[in-house]
Amino acid sequence: MHKRKGPPGPPGRGAAAARQLGLLVDLSPDGLMIPEDGANDEELEAEFLALVGGQPPALEKLKGKGPLPMEAIEKMASLCMRDPDEDEEEGTDEDDLEADDDLLAELNEVLGEEQKASETPPPVAQPKPEAPHPGLETTLQERLALYQTAIESARQAGDSAKMRRYDRGLKTLENLLASIRKGNAIDEADIPPPVAIGKGPASTPTYSPAPTQPAPRIASAPEPRVTLEGPSATAPASSPGLAKPQMPPGPCSPGPLAQLQSRQRDYKLAALHAKQQGDTTAAARHFRVAKSFDAVLEALSRGEPVDLSCLPPPPDQLPPDPPSPPSQPPTPATAPSTTEVPPPPRTLLEALEQRMERYQVAAAQAKSKGDQRKARMHERIVKQYQDAIRAHKAGRAVDVAELPVPPGFPPIQGLEATKPTQQSLVGVLETAMKLANQDEGPEDEEDEVPKKQNSPVAPTAQPKAPPSRTPQSGSAPTAKAPPKATSTRAQQQLAFLEGRKKQLLQAALRAKQKNDVEGAKMHLRQAKGLEPMLEASRNGLPVDITKVPPAPVNKDDFALVQRPGPGLSQEAARRYGELTKLIRQQHEMCLNHSNQFTQLGNITETTKFEKLAEDCKRSMDILKQAFVRGLPTPTARFEQRTFSVIKIFPDLSSNDMLLFIVKGINLPTPPGLSPGDLDVFVRFDFPYPNVEEAQKDKTSVIKNTDSPEFKEQFKLCINRSHRGFRRAIQTKGIKFEVVHKGGLFKTDRVLGTAQLKLDALEIACEVREILEVLDGRRPTGGRLEVMVRIREPLTAQQLETTTERWLVIDPVPAAVPTQVAGPKGKAPPVPAPARESGNRSARPLHSLSVLAFDQERLERKILALRQARRPVPPEVAQQYQDIMQRSQWQRAQLEQGGVGIRREYAAQLERQLQFYTEAARRLGNDGSRDAAKEALYRRNLVESELQRLRR
């Protein structure tokens, strides 16, 4: 590398000399220096001839000499670009001068000044020609405003974690914006993603319309900067063989910097020559190619690798520019963006999975590049999406506004139309309804939707429009399939909301009739508040039922307030009171369980208990009508109903824990004493809040037995949210000591110890154990029964299946009163089921033995699940309930029916006997031995029952 001997001259001397020779003219296609009318052609020719020949135009015309060849032009141009100081000091070759960093910086400064003069004068702060980036700068400004708005919203909401996260993104955006204004290259992946607070779409349209200019600035490698230019986009198709022979002679050829500068100079001179010949189009084209070398030279100066195989060919080998190249460059630039963005999702789950996959890919790319900070950031976002997907699959509501949105993806469920300050449920639901209406609009709007979705890539979307319409029309039935899968839940949700609104309106009407204006207004406001939820539910959107107000209860609905009808005896009135009390208790139980499941967001169980509450209301209306008419008590019966309920102890507060010491069993006897001489008490130690302040107590002394029954309870103080309490129940538990009470001058003697683990309180509100009493580590044979109870589990609600005796009242006929308790003076409060002649054909008859077998098998399954502290599946509980109801109904029919129904039952048993026989034979031939054994066992049950019936 050549070093200067003297001090460097003042900057700009080479530029001044170049300007004097007329080389540095602006060949921009705007026509500032190249007018189309040819007014300055003579001046340009004079400057060019003065440059190459050094004589005035008149002498050249007299001599009749033409312009010099291109080699001379290259030589003169290289001489003009040399520094005068170096010419005076020593003669150096052209390559050494071009490799000098100071001269390159000076030349770039001159070129930047010339381009800035030819362009608009306002942007003075942008010294480099490639610095302006309208697309990226606008995107950064809008993203900056978006993050500022998000920080303000988080500050108002008091969310400090979100404020810190947005503040980090804001600082990153400010640094990137400052870098791009200085003309530095930035990485697109460093831009923080938009926050989904309602202004997401504002950044996406401004980001994608300019794919041709910002792309060379963003890419780390210089190849895209050359290939994205107009002429070079077509060059690789025709010049692969021309670019590759320049690479092998590496030692013989000049360096990459000199080669790039030489090729850039060729294009500049070609542009000047084309302008001299009047071809302004070719001049502008060559000038654009020459300007594309600036980005490559800048990358090379930073030490980045440069692939010279993508170098444009010499100007004379450049293929002619077709008339429609302006529409072609966006195609390769926007094609990757269209492939990266997946098709619009049909469901919320699909949208969440698409965005999670996009962030997983981004995390993998960041890891491959060694950017651990960005990889960890994307992995945290992936974790958020995984939690959201699990919550959505579990049936819980997902707040999509809290999830980041990848670049190029639209916000989920119409959040782009909401304002960041609009936090009401009404606005969110209205926006979601608009989006749903747009997605499910008529077919004549299909042309408008792709344009809105693909507006950044409109040139590439137009040729693909016809094939895209065909899959849409063909996939229309499949697009409607997901709503069918979730139609049951949506229908339950809609029915629940409509029923609750009806209840609130009825309560408002009752309050108005009682002159309770404030109560009527309150219920009316609550009913009006359900309308946005109803609209969203009708459009298939999930709603948060935990915000639905509870159902108002009218005490008069479950009381016999009217006078009894004429002729009603006191015994019948007493039975009416008993039935009313049972119905009221059932209704209260239904409302309690419904409210509990509503708070959990379980719409299925909530709807089930709401229906049971309505049945209780109808039963109460039947009782009232019969009571007013003076009729005997309507036909009533008890059925076995199985429910999934939330186990809770409402009499306990959240800071109470009850310890029950029930009894001891076969406690060990110390030497010298008989079991009848034991005087036993139990003391316990619960190390909370700490070991020094442990809660301790003891039972009373039970004398003269080794199996004492204490039946004592102790209330312990806890703090459910305290970490020390969690640590105490997970690792320590409660320690018990079984002690024999000493007599006079005798100390107490410890018979053994026991330890109760409390980790089961995480998922259960009651722990009941029979502990083994140990002497150190040696079992003593004695046992101690204890129980611990809290209000509700620590981490999740405890669901359990319970079977209740459910009172059902049959409707009273309109004309004929029900004769149930007339002839019988000592009828029970709840009569037996009435016989109905039409029921024989309403339900098919089954073998009672087979039904009992199925019932016993389900009971064993439910018992095993309860012992394992696992919830009983709803389908198992429903199947058990159906079998119980069918057995009860069929026994009642056979007991009250005559000979006809018994004959029908015998014929049905014969058909079932034949069916099970054939099924056992067929399954045995197929190799299904277990199924064949079960079919054979059922056949034997039917045969035994048929024999008993024939006797």
Curated annotation (Swiss-Prot):
GO terms in the biological process aspect are: apical dendrite arborization; endosome organization; negative regulation of snRNA transcription by RNA polymerase II; positive regulation of canonical NF-kappaB signal transduction; regulation of postsynapse assembly; regulation of respiratory gaseous exchange by nervous system process; regulation of transcription by RNA polymerase II
Q: Where on the chain is Phosphothreonine found, per UniProt? A: T92, T204, T206
Q: Which GO terms describe its cellular component?
A: centrosome; ciliary basal body; cytosol; endosome membrane; extracellular exosome; fibrillar center; glutamatergic synapse; membrane
Any idea which UniProt keywords this protein has? Coiled coil, Cytoplasm, Cytoskeleton, DNA-binding, Intellectual disability, Nucleus, Phosphoprotein, Repressor, Transcription, Transcription regulation
**Coiled-coil ranges from the UniProt annotation:** 346-392, 484-517
Biased segments, Acidic residues type: 84-104
Question: How does it get modified after it is made?
Answer: Phosphorylation on Ser-208 by CDK1 promotes spindle pole localization and association with SCC1/RAD21.
One GO molecular-function entry: RNA polymerase II cis-regulatory region sequence-specific DNA binding
Task: Spell out the Pfam families in the cross-references.
Answer: C2, CC2D1A-B_DM14
Q: Where is the composition biased (Low complexity)?
A: 201-210, 475-488
Subcellular location per the Swiss-Prot or TrEMBL entry: Cytoplasm; Nucleus; Cytoplasm, Cytoskeleton, Microtubule organizing center, Centrosome
**Stretches assigned to the C2 domain:** 637-771
Give residue numbers for the modification (Phosphoserine): S208, S253, S324, S455
Task: Tell me the segments the record calls region Disordered.
Answer: 80-139, 185-266, 306-346, 437-491, 818-841
| Compositionally skewed regions (Pro residues) per UniProt | 311-333
Q: Which Gene3D superfamilies match?
A: C2 domain
Q: What is its main location?
A: cytoplasm
InterPro entries, A to Z: C2_dom, C2_domain_sf, C2_Freud, CC2D1A/B, CC2D1A/B_DM14
Q: What is known of its domains?
A: The C2 domain is required for the repression.
The task this protein performs is described as: Transcription factor that binds specifically to the DRE (dual repressor element) and represses HTR1A gene transcription in neuronal cells. The combination of calcium and ATP specifically inactivates the binding with FRE. May play a role in the altered regulation of HTR1A associated with anxiety and major depression. Mediates HDAC-independent repression of HTR1A promoter in neuronal cell. Performs essential function in controlling functional maturation of synapses. Plays distinct roles depending on its localization. When cytoplasmic, acts as a scaffold protein in the PI3K/PDK1/AKT pathway.
Q: Which disease is it linked to?
A: Intellectual developmental disorder, autosomal recessive 3: A disorder characterized by significantly below average general intellectual functioning associated with impairments in adaptive behavior and manifested during the developmental period.
In the record, the note on similarity to other proteins reads: Belongs to the CC2D1 family.
Q: Spell out the PANTHER family in the cross-references.
A: COILED-COIL AND C2 DOMAIN-CONTAINING PROTEIN 1-LIKE (PTHR13076), COILED-COIL AND C2 DOMAIN-CONTAINING PROTEIN 1A (PTHR13076:SF8)
> Mind telling me what this protein is named?
Coiled-coil and C2 domain-containing protein 1A
The organism named in the record is Homo sapiens
